[in-house]
């Protein structure tokens, strides 16, 4: 992929991200679950937008999780444990500009299977 094409893809994702973020907001009882996907790993956090604080976060690098569907399922299990420890069972899913497909969809479905209502 050329640098020009890559820049365009990133710009389109940022545009989608801003459009989505204008419509959703999380609070302490129902935080925003934001996921970031790199080529190698995944990161996820629960954010209270009112106080601008991170309530829970899981780093895929520290767990040795790769950015594939199996890794997304494992990350969702760990993240669900972290949310349940904070007594959070409802959240708003922020796909962070990524298409709801593949790894992102696998993460969301696994989070629902582990008892977090999105």
Curated annotation (Swiss-Prot):
One of its GO terms (biological process) is translation. Keywords: Ribonucleoprotein, Ribosomal protein, RNA-binding, rRNA-binding. It comes from the Bacteria. GO terms for molecular function: 5S rRNA binding; structural constituent of ribosome. Signal peptide: none annotated. The keyword Ribonucleoprotein applies. GO terms for cellular component: cytosolic large ribosomal subunit. Part of the 50S ribosomal subunit; part of the 5S rRNA/L5/L18/L25 subcomplex. Contacts the 5S and 23S rRNAs. Belongs to the universal ribosomal protein uL18 family. This is one of the proteins that bind and probably mediate the attachment of the 5S RNA into the large ribosomal subunit, where it forms part of the central protuberance. This is Large ribosomal subunit protein uL18. It comes from Campylobacter concisus (strain 13826). The lineage of its organism: Bacteria, Pseudomonadati, Campylobacterota, Epsilonproteobacteria, Campylobacterales. The gene is rplR.
């Amino acid at each position: 992929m050329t640098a020009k094409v890559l820049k365009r893809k990133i710009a389109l994702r940022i545009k989608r991200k801003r459009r989505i973020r204008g419509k959703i907001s999380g609070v302490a009882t129902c935080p925003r679950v934001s996921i970031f996907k790199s080529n190698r790993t995944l990161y996820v956090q629960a954010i209270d937008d009112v106080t601008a604080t991170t309530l829970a976060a899981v780093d895929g690098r520290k767990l040795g999780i790769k950015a594939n569907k199996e890794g997304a399922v494992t990350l969702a299990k760990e993240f669900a444990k972290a949310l349940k420890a904070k007594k959070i069972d409802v959240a708003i899913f922020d796909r962070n500009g990524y298409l709801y497909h593949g790894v992102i969809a696998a993460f969301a479905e696994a989070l629902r299977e582990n008892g977090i209502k999105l």
